[in-house]
Protein backbone atom coordinates (compact mmCIF):
# COMPACT_ATOMS: atom_id res chain seq x y z
CA UNK A 1 0.00 0.00 0.00
CA UNK A 2 1.37 3.40 -1.02
CA UNK A 3 1.11 6.43 1.27
CA UNK A 4 -0.27 9.70 -0.09
CA UNK A 5 1.60 12.95 0.33
CA UNK A 6 -1.04 14.09 2.82
CA UNK A 7 -0.50 10.98 4.96
CA UNK A 8 3.26 11.54 4.94
CA UNK A 9 2.83 15.19 5.95
CA UNK A 10 0.47 14.23 8.79
CA UNK A 11 2.93 11.60 10.02
CA UNK A 12 5.80 14.12 10.03
CA UNK A 13 3.64 16.77 11.73
CA UNK A 14 2.95 14.40 14.62
CA UNK A 15 6.69 13.86 15.29
CA UNK A 16 8.82 15.73 17.81
CA UNK A 17 11.68 17.96 16.68
CA UNK A 18 14.31 15.41 17.68
CA UNK A 19 12.47 12.68 15.73
CA UNK A 20 12.35 14.93 12.65
CA UNK A 21 16.10 15.60 12.94
CA UNK A 22 16.71 11.83 13.07
CA UNK A 23 14.45 11.38 10.02
CA UNK A 24 16.35 14.03 8.06
CA UNK A 25 19.69 12.43 8.96
CA UNK A 26 18.43 9.00 7.88
CA UNK A 27 17.14 10.43 4.58
CA UNK A 28 20.47 12.17 3.93
CA UNK A 29 22.32 8.88 4.44
CA UNK A 30 19.84 6.81 2.40
CA UNK A 31 19.75 9.14 -0.63
CA UNK A 32 23.28 10.56 -0.39
CA UNK A 33 22.16 14.19 -0.23
CA UNK A 34 22.54 17.08 2.19
CA UNK A 35 19.66 19.21 3.47
CA UNK A 36 22.08 22.10 4.12
CA UNK A 37 22.16 23.14 0.44
CA UNK A 38 18.38 23.33 0.35
CA UNK A 39 18.32 25.36 3.56
CA UNK A 40 20.75 27.91 2.12
CA UNK A 41 18.62 28.31 -1.02
CA UNK A 42 15.46 28.74 1.04
CA UNK A 43 17.13 31.26 3.37
CA UNK A 44 18.28 33.39 0.42
CA UNK A 45 14.71 33.92 -0.83
CA UNK A 46 13.24 35.70 2.21
CA UNK A 47 16.37 37.83 2.63
CA UNK A 48 15.88 39.27 -0.84
CA UNK A 49 12.23 40.02 -0.12
CA UNK A 50 13.15 41.79 3.12
CA UNK A 51 15.81 43.77 1.31
CA UNK A 52 13.26 45.12 -1.16
CA UNK A 53 11.10 46.43 1.67
CA UNK A 54 13.85 48.62 3.12
CA UNK A 55 13.94 50.99 0.17
CA UNK A 56 11.01 53.17 -0.82
CA UNK A 57 10.22 55.59 -3.63
CA UNK A 58 8.36 58.85 -2.98
CA UNK A 59 6.07 59.75 -5.88
CA UNK A 60 4.47 63.18 -6.26
CA UNK A 61 1.01 62.21 -7.54
CA UNK A 62 -0.49 65.71 -7.76
CA UNK A 63 0.70 69.18 -6.79
CA UNK A 64 -2.72 70.28 -5.57
CA UNK A 65 -3.95 73.88 -5.52
CA UNK A 66 -0.94 75.48 -3.79
CA UNK A 67 1.84 74.79 -6.30
CA UNK A 68 4.14 77.47 -4.87
CA UNK A 69 4.26 75.80 -1.45
CA UNK A 70 4.77 72.39 -3.05
CA UNK A 71 7.62 73.72 -5.22
CA UNK A 72 9.29 75.15 -2.09
CA UNK A 73 8.89 71.82 -0.29
CA UNK A 74 10.30 69.92 -3.29
CA UNK A 75 13.29 72.29 -3.47
CA UNK A 76 13.98 71.83 0.23
CA UNK A 77 13.71 68.05 0.05
CA UNK A 78 15.63 67.43 -3.16
CA UNK A 79 18.07 70.34 -3.39
CA UNK A 80 16.88 71.14 -6.91
CA UNK A 81 16.93 74.65 -8.31
CA UNK A 82 13.74 76.67 -8.74
CA UNK A 83 13.23 75.80 -12.42
CA UNK A 84 13.97 72.09 -11.92
CA UNK A 85 11.63 71.88 -8.91
CA UNK A 86 8.89 73.73 -10.83
CA UNK A 87 9.28 71.40 -13.83
CA UNK A 88 9.16 68.36 -11.55
CA UNK A 89 6.00 69.55 -9.78
CA UNK A 90 4.29 70.38 -13.07
CA UNK A 91 5.15 66.97 -14.54
CA UNK A 92 3.34 65.09 -11.73
CA UNK A 93 3.07 62.18 -11.28
CA UNK A 94 6.83 62.08 -10.89
CA UNK A 95 9.37 60.37 -8.65
CA UNK A 96 10.86 62.77 -6.09
CA UNK A 97 13.25 60.43 -4.31
CA UNK A 98 14.02 56.78 -4.89
CA UNK A 99 15.61 54.13 -2.71
CA UNK A 100 15.21 55.93 0.62
CA UNK A 101 14.38 54.54 4.06
CA UNK A 102 10.81 54.23 5.27
CA UNK A 103 11.28 56.91 7.92
CA UNK A 104 12.71 59.38 5.43
CA UNK A 105 9.93 58.57 2.96
CA UNK A 106 7.22 59.11 5.61
CA UNK A 107 8.77 62.43 6.69
CA UNK A 108 8.97 63.64 3.09
CA UNK A 109 5.38 62.57 2.45
CA UNK A 110 4.17 64.45 5.53
CA UNK A 111 6.08 67.59 4.55
CA UNK A 112 4.70 67.59 1.00
CA UNK A 113 1.14 66.82 2.10
CA UNK A 114 1.27 69.75 4.52
CA UNK A 115 2.18 71.92 1.51
CA UNK A 116 -0.92 70.61 -0.30
CA UNK A 117 0.50 67.86 -2.53
CA UNK A 118 -0.78 64.32 -2.96
CA UNK A 119 2.08 61.89 -2.39
CA UNK A 120 2.46 58.11 -2.73
CA UNK A 121 5.10 55.85 -1.23
CA UNK A 122 5.97 52.75 -3.22
From Swiss-Prot:
A GO term, aspect molecular function: mRNA binding
Protein name (record): Large ribosomal subunit protein bL12
Family as reported in the entry's similarity comment: Belongs to the bacterial ribosomal protein bL12 family.
Keyword Amino-acid biosynthesis: no
InterPro entries xref list: Ribosomal_bL12, Ribosomal_bL12_C, Ribosomal_bL12_C/ClpS-like, Ribosomal_bL12_oligo, Ribosomal_bL12_oligo_N_sf
Pfam families (UniProt xref): Ribosomal_L12 (PF00542), Ribosomal_L12_N (PF16320)
Top-rank taxon: Bacteria
GO cellular component: cytosolic large ribosomal subunit
Organism lineage: Bacteria, Pseudomonadati, Pseudomonadota, Gammaproteobacteria, Pasteurellales
BP GO annotations: translation
Coiled-coil regions listed in the entry: none
PANTHER family named in the record: 39S RIBOSOMAL PROTEIN L12 (PTHR45987), LARGE RIBOSOMAL SUBUNIT PROTEIN BL12M (PTHR45987:SF4)
Key words of the record: Ribonucleoprotein, Ribosomal protein
